[in-house]
């Protein structure tokens, strides 16, 4: 989506890869792009590592199991450098969605990085 916003029109990417597989269209739909153009003021991007940290933080701290795509909003608020912009704008709401995460993926996310890094 960021490439499309920058270009001012929907852009087709050659390849996309992320732990957040639900956020990986190679091209945003025309209607989605139109809505983003009209209603979105700012975009904060997050890394896969920040998303993984958010998945782990949500599970350990909030006792919520959220798939990586659904944890991207929490990653922006909790860990992304752009999240600091949110602190100056008053109340922030992060919608969490999706429990579509397998036990195997959840275990692998915890195995990839040290658990203490999200506490």
Where are the regions that the model predicts?
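Glycine-rich phosphate/pyrophosphate-binding loop at beta-loop-alpha junctions
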Residues: 1-39, 83-119
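Active-site-adjacent helical/loop segments in soluble small-molecule enzymes
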Residues: 29-89
């Amino acid at each position: 989506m960021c490439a499309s916003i920058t270009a001012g029109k929907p852009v087709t990417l050659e390849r996309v890869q992320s732990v957040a597989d639900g956020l990986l269209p190679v091209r945003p739909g025309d209607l989605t792009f139109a809505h983003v153009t009209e209603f979105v003021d700012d975009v904060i991007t997050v890394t896969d590592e920040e998303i993984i940290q958010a998945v782990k933080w949500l599970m350990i701290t909030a006792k919520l199991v959220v798939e990586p795509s659904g944890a991207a909003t929490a990653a922006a608020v909790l860990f992304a450098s752009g999240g600091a912009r949110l602190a100056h704008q008053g109340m922030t709401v992060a919608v969490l969605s999706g429990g579509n995460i397998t036990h195997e993926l959840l275990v692998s996310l915890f195995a990839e990085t040290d658990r203490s890094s999200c506490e």
